[in-house]
Amino acid sequence: MRKVLLLAVVLLGVFAFFAFDLGRFLSLAYLKESQAGFAELYAQKPLQVVGTYFLIYVAATALSLPGATIITLAGGALFGLWWGTLIVSFASSIGATLAFLVSRYALRSSVEAKFGNRLTEINKGVEKEGAFYLFTLRLIPVVPFFVINLLMGLTKMKTVVFYAVSQIGMLAGTLVYVNAGTQLAQIDSLQGILSPALLGSFVLLGLFPLIARKIVSAVQKRKVYARWASVRPQTFDRNLIVIGAGAGGLVSAYIAATVKAKVTLVEAHKMGGDCLNYGCVPSKALIKSAKLAHQMRHASNYGLSDTTPTFSFKAVMQRIQDVIRAIEPHDSVERYTGLGVEVLQGYAKLINPWTVQIALNDGGTQTLTTRSVVIAAGAQPFVPPLPGLEEVGYVTSDTLWETFGQFDEIPQRLVVLGGGPIGCELAQSFARLGARVTQVEMASRIMIREDEEVSELAKASLEADGVRVLTSHKALRCERVDGAKTLVIEHAGAELRIAFDQLICAVGRSARLTGYGLEDLGIPTNRTVDTNEYLQTLYPNIYAAGDVAGPYQFTHVAAHQAWYAAVNALFGEWKMFKADYSVIPWATFIDPEVARVGLNEQEAKEKGIAVEVT
């Protein structure tokens, strides 16, 4: 009830302002015409004039009405520079705080709907820098005064903090505008405020928060590095050390070598990472073989005769290895060495922010110092903690290529655990090659990150190829019944059993966060390595890119992030670049393929972005 009453008062005030055309009194022309009369009245009744002016200013700012600039100029014209600044400073801060409270208690839903995108950014700033963030917003004139008041009311900032910071932060800008008001007789238009002297004042106002940020950043850096100050090298062996030779690591090293930086790339296992050895390349090779088999069975769709494909499963799996070997030279040690990258095969560990120790695969150890590090350690399949899973055995999207490559025949009964892109691609492909595939997904639909109709289309496509798709089914445990492997699942309170020959775990991938020193350095992680918008970790000279950094687990995004990580690591002293995810291509290679660029409908709705569906 109180919120309704408060909102009614606010709306009544706004209605009265426009209904009675009160805005005509808030024009430069009216102010100049009335200046002499106001001055005479002020000389006769100073307290009444100051009080009335103060209340008008507070009301206008509290209701977020247009005209604050004119009222501020009037303060300078009537009261002079110092008294005008004092009066306007308190009136504007009190009015802003009232608008802040109105937004917090009465306008939350409407303001969020109108300024949702700005609110997201401001919330991030408030969470990270709190009062200092508001202070910088108050200092920069290009940020609308009323927008800050309304949006800050939706944050968790305390009212007393908002008032105090606004009072201090707006003081310099108030002084500039009040000073302009004292020269009102010489100003013919609002553009006249931007005289060279005043323009210089605004330039200083704009530069001040940047300088302040630099100072704060330097203080924060010093604090972060304090425990390591005694071991910071005077000189460095490398400009950049890259940990991991997947897409993110290879691109980072390539960029560093291109600009003639001293760069070392460390890889413990296979060059090319997940994409070449376990992900993109082998899965697409499998999909191609499966799709061709499907087209042969349905050749009549192309005006040909339907044909049952005959093939050796071992030959299909061997072809996948052949495709990998054909691409390997592009990601090889030899190629990158030729580009100027030092490639070390072994396990890297961060000893301190500038020192990396490498346990070489040949048994040796090498320790290098570096100005910057890019962590591109990738991700690994997540295996759910199902009772009995280890006993019955399973494969993942990493291990199935080698395991299935040993089979002469395709496993007849396959269970694919997981309804994401990887699970769907594998389920359809093996079904097209002759396996009886059951796909189990705990969520209400497969490919849950796509729009609902897309998920339904994907399900229909998989079922048309013979995949038994079970959504809203939860895997409980694995058992052996009379020697047969069985997965026990639950649906609608009832338990079901599915016999299988092979089980593929495809429930997602988790970032590699242990084994290379993150925990020893205290670098925060939360499913991925915590990074800022420049891909910096807790230590500004240590960056992360690819699956280990998130938020996407795509090869092309890893390469995309690698550019930002490498360039910022090498040239961040002069210029930093924020990672841009505004246009991310996204494809799942079931048949028909599911692809998009940027947000889909459900993501847009979650972000409060209006969409048009055609």
Question: Could you describe each region identified by the protein language model?
Answer:
Residues D306-T307, E342-Q345, K349-G363, L368, ...:
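A Rossmann-like FAD-binding core segment of flavoenzymes
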Residues R238-L265, G423-R432:
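N-terminal Rossmann-like FAD-binding beta1-loop-alpha1 element of flavoenzymes
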Residues G13-Y53, S89, S93-N149, L154-T155, ...:
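Membrane-interfacial helix-loop-helix
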Residues S230-L240, A245-L250, T258, D451-E453, ...:
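Mid-to-C-terminal Rossmann-like scaffold of FAD/NAD(P)H-dependent oxidoreductases
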